[in-house]
Amino acid sequence: MATTTGTSRSKGTQPTPQKITTFLWFDRNAEEAVNFYVSVFKNSEIRNTTHYGDAGAGPKGTVMTIAFDLDGQQFVALNGGPTFKFTEAISLMVNCETQQEIDYFWEKLSGDGGQEVECGWVKDKFGLSWQIVPNYIYEVWQEGDEAKTDRMMKAVMTMKKFDIAGLKKAAEGK
């Protein structure tokens, strides 16, 4: 049986759970990961922490789950042991308005042992994959201009971290 300890960083009532909440399975470093993520994203908080009781996959009294919000999105992290690992089959997408925002998230999420990957992807130091994407890509897609989209996508395929100015230049055929 698990015990619950509220560790909310804000006052007030706990929000109603989202219909769909992302659940992240960590080996034994969920607390470190959650503290890192909450430090990276604005409007983020740890809402609740549960600890293992007499039964479960972890030693009694150690952190089992952590409910947290990242910029308004609810997540739960689990210290579940080494059974499962993250893969690129699942990633979290961060939509960015400016190059400054892209640079910020890229640096934070790929740093300290993370890995830069092609096409705006990074794998953080915990093995979780993220896509750092400029909103400009969606704007071009919504325009419906196939030639412009093709030119932009060719540029996308050559980049690791997205460069909005470079994407715009490519999309315009310059």
Where in this protein do the model-derived segments appear?
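Vicinal oxygen chelate
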Residues: 26, 30, 40, 70-74, ...
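Core segments of cupin and vicinal oxygen chelate
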Residues: 24-72
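Short loop/turn microsegments at loop-to-beta-strand junctions
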Residues: 21, 63-64, 117-119
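C-terminal cap/linker of serine protease catalytic domains
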Residues: 11, 144-174
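Basic/polar N-terminal segments that are highly enriched at the extreme N-terminus
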Residues: 1-18, 168-174
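Residues that flank catalytic or metal-binding motifs in active/ligand-binding sites
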Residues: 18, 64, 88
